[in-house]
Amino acid sequence: MRRARGKFKGGNSALRVNVPKENAISDYVTASGTFQDGDIMLNKEGIRVVSQTQTSTPAANGNISLSDLETVKVLGKGSGGVVQLVRHKWTNETYALKVIHMNIEETTRKQIVQELKINHASQCPYVVICYHAFYNNGLISIVLEYMDGGSLADIMKELEPKCIKEPNLGVVCKQVLLGLMYLHQTRHIIHRDIKPSNLLVNHKGEVKISDFGVSAVLANSMAVRDTFVGTCTYMSPERVLGGTYGFDSDIWSLGLTLLECALGKYPYQPPGSEEGWMNFYELLQTIVDQPPPVAPADQFSPEFCSFISACLQKDPKCRPTAAELLNHPFVNKYDEEEYGLAKLLPPLVPLA
């Protein structure tokens, strides 16, 4: 296979990583026990953003304190912490509580703070809500909206065949595009990690964007980035090459995500092998060198095939914006009431 053009090179010998100086967690904690990183302050009473350019930041939910929350079960673990399903003792409302031990490597800590800042300031029905956050005894606790339907990746695992039908994806697509349009146009944020496991669903069938740990906030909507973060398998070719990129990189990731959900498998498959990619670098070279995957015309509508092709343009300048894609025929092809994801979810089981 040909070596990818540009900055990307396969093989461990080509990798060079500059490791920045690590700061201890104590460098971020004041004498009063408040965690401060840049313009964000956290303590056991809650969160405060001390120099906010936006005036639209929602006030933290004053009805929530950590002592009012009781753990129901553990939902998952990762990034140096745990996510729990918790219930408010007095209102019986449920939340997802992300608890992170901040004595972790600085890069991960910065990502967590970045996620918190973005979530706390976001006001969009297509972005997971952050209700409150606290810092106490080395732990940051983030109170998030509980998406009880899991992720698109979770839903696919429970279906047979393990894929989401095109009409359902049409409804999903519209909601994700509305979320991306808000992030790109209003917040000037590149998500940088759109994938099935980061698109969450609730029992109403509402789809919301989550996990902003690697997102980039740009000074304006015309700016670009050149850092290499996110899930590599969903990266656009220009990101794999280490070049500059903008909001259009999220559009590539969306196209790849929708195609994976439709096919029931990751769209880039190794030629002549059913066992998956044996070499990670070969996959990245394929993303850079080979034509992008397409939706099979004998399995999907012309509108869906056209939408996927529009997203998976290797030249980022040729990809439409989220706002432009909202006018694509595929997005409004299917009725939201008839094809919402709520019908694919199992019945809700009452909490004990």
Swiss-Prot record:
GO terms for molecular function: ATP binding; MAP kinase kinase activity; protein serine kinase activity; protein serine/threonine kinase activity; protein tyrosine kinase activity. The active site is at D193. The keyword ATP-binding applies. Induction: Slightly induced in response to chitosan. Its EC number is 2.7.12.2. GO terms for biological process: defense response; response to chitin. One of its GO terms (cellular component) is cytoplasm. This is Mitogen-activated protein kinase kinase 1a. It comes from Physcomitrium patens (Spreading-leaved earth moss). The lineage of its organism: Eukaryota, Viridiplantae, Streptophyta, Embryophyta, Bryophyta. The gene is MKK1a.
